[in-house]
UniProtKB/Swiss-Prot annotation:
GO terms for molecular function: GTP binding; GTPase activity; metal ion binding. This is tRNA modification GTPase MnmE. The gene is mnmE. Exhibits a very high intrinsic GTPase hydrolysis rate. Involved in the addition of a carboxymethylaminomethyl (cmnm) group at the wobble position (U34) of certain tRNAs, forming tRNA-cmnm(5)s(2)U34. Its cofactor is K(+). InterPro entries: G_TrmE, GTP-bd, GTP-bd_TrmE_N, GTPase_MnmE, MnmE_dom2, MnmE_helical, P-loop_NTPase, Small_GTP-bd. Belongs to the TRAFAC class TrmE-Era-EngA-EngB-Septin-like GTPase superfamily. TrmE GTPase family. One of its GO terms (biological process) is tRNA methylation. Homodimer. Heterotetramer of two MnmE and two MnmG subunits.
């Protein structure tokens, strides 16, 4: 597959719509435009034209816009045809383009190939390219703002600034190693220790902000677990603000998981209602209970719901023993509205009424706390787990470099190597040092046409 052949795809989402776009990118598309429209197109001007089949039949009418390289999304020539958003119409326009450009090497685009070309042509760095997909996938206003902040280069600029400072420090180390006859006390002359301290402080700040960005992008997988009829489905409905799950007084109503995404202060939470945990001879219910335990195993957070009107029994004890120790568990006591006296719960628990709305605001705030969300923090950009991992790797190498800095100039070669590794970790975020396998994995997750 040639990276330089022209490519074409429908750029708008599948389905019917008012407007649909066919996008083409590649070298020297002026010739293709001449073939399609019988006339040249002025760059960066919208031309209202008929889109014709090879036999002259008018397929549609719309706007044709030609962007001449390098002033385009991909950095190549780009031709966009904007017509009506019917799937059949767009397929015919795309087919006509591929037919007209066949001898020019025009082919259908792969998923994410337009953005990959933008990256390869240095129109975007890798973090910005990922932000394109995140902006498309954003499910809340906060996530969309965070993705736009990343796309504008805010995150990349912070990473590049740290990277440049590490390079400068490493350059001084290498110079000292290359000219040992000068007998320079590097660590003292160039204030390596305070420079490292400042670098470490700024990197730690960036890591904290990246954690917020990961939470905003990926959210939390929250599983509602407990015995039958403790109010799991009622709580799901209350948090969602809609009747998502069926609620009846019959034990075992929920047989399979019900997943609903909600947003609290812009943070996405994937709430999973599950089958009630109990001993049963019902084959179908048993399958649902096994699936419940699988969901519990993969949860980021478990809400263990209990009915305050019923005393704890052996089943509650069994559930507590089997809950995974590595996963945070919040004990939630439901149906407090049915009590005559005030409920005295456990220290680290919440008392609520899913149906009456009591305690739900406190529960929402506790969910954000357990997610690690800091509402008072600086408005974050979106980040991915790979970004956070790379930042943490860089921090580890700076920590080792700091240990060497406490010694003397005899370990400057080790000091320089740790700086090199820290720099390498940071450049992996923006794509200056990234394997082809990782690039393929990132861009394959994009939609076709982007």
């Amino acid at each position: 597959m040639s990276l330089y052949a022209p490519i074409a795809a429908i750029a708008t989402a599948p389905g019917r719509g008012g407007i649909g776009v066919v996008r083409i990118s590649g070298p020297d598309l002026a010739e293709l435009a001449q073939r399609l429209f019988g006339r040249p197109l002025t760059p960066r001007h919208a031309h209202y034209l008929p889109f014709r089949a090879a036999d002259g039949e008018v397929i549609d009418e719309g706007l044709a816009i030609y962007f001449r390289a390098p002033h385009s999304y991909t950095g190549e020539d780009v031709l966009e045809l904007q017509g009506h958003g019917g799937p059949a119409v767009l397929r015919r326009i795309l087919a006509r383009c591929l037919q007209a450009g066949h001898d020019l090497g025009l082919r259908p685009a792969e998923p994410g190939e337009f953005t990959r070309r933008a990256f390869l042509n240095e129109r975007l760095d890798l973090a910005q390219a990922e932000a394109v997909a995140d902006l498309i996938d954003a499910s809340s206003e906060a996530a969309a703002r965070g993705a736009m902040a990343s796309l504008s280069g805010e995150f990349s600029q912070r990473v590049n600034d740290l990277s440049d400072r590490i390079i400068h420090l490493r350059m001084l180390v290498e110079a000292t190693l290359d000219f040992p006859e000068e007998e320079i006390d590097f660590l003292e002359k160039y204030q390596a220790r305070p420079t490292l301290q400042a670098l470490t402080h700024d990197l730690d700040t960036l890591i904290a902000q990246a954690r917020q960005g990961v939470i905003l992008r990926e959210g939390l997988h929250v599983v509602l677990a407990g015995k039958p009829n403790v109010g799991k489905s009622s709580l799901l409905n209350a948090l969602a603000g809609d009747d998502i799950a069926i609620v009846t007084p019959i034990a075992g109503t929920t047989r399979d998981k019900v997943v609903q995404e909600i947003h609290i202060d812009g943070v996405p939470l994937h709430i999973v209602d599950t089958a009630g945990l109990r001993d049963t001879d019902d084959a179908v219910e048993s399958i649902g209970i096994e699936r419940t335990w699988k969901e519990i195993e993969r949860a980021d957070l478990i809400l263990h719901l209990q009915d305050v009107t019923q005393p704890p029994d052996h089943l509650d004890a069994q559930i507590v023993r089997r809950l995974p120790a590595r996963t945070p568990v919040l004990n939630v006591f439901n149906k407090v509205d049915l009590l005559d006296a005030a409920f005295q719960g456990q220290p680290d628990s919440l008392a609520i009424s899913a149906r009456g709305g009591i305690g739900l605001d406190a529960l929402r705030q506790r969910l954000l706390q357990l997610a690690g969300w800091n509402p008072g923090a600086e408005s974050p950009w979106l980040a991915r787990e790979r970004h956070l991992h790379a930042l943490q790797q860089a921090a580890q190498h700076l920590e080792i470099a700091t240990e060497h800095a406490r010694e003397d100039d005899r370990v400057l070669d080790l000091f320089a190597e740790e700086l090199r590794l820290a720099h390498e970790a940071l450049t992996g975020i923006t794509g200056k040092f990234t394997s082809d396998d990782l690039l393929g994995e990132i861009f394959s997750s994009f939609c076709i046409g982007k």
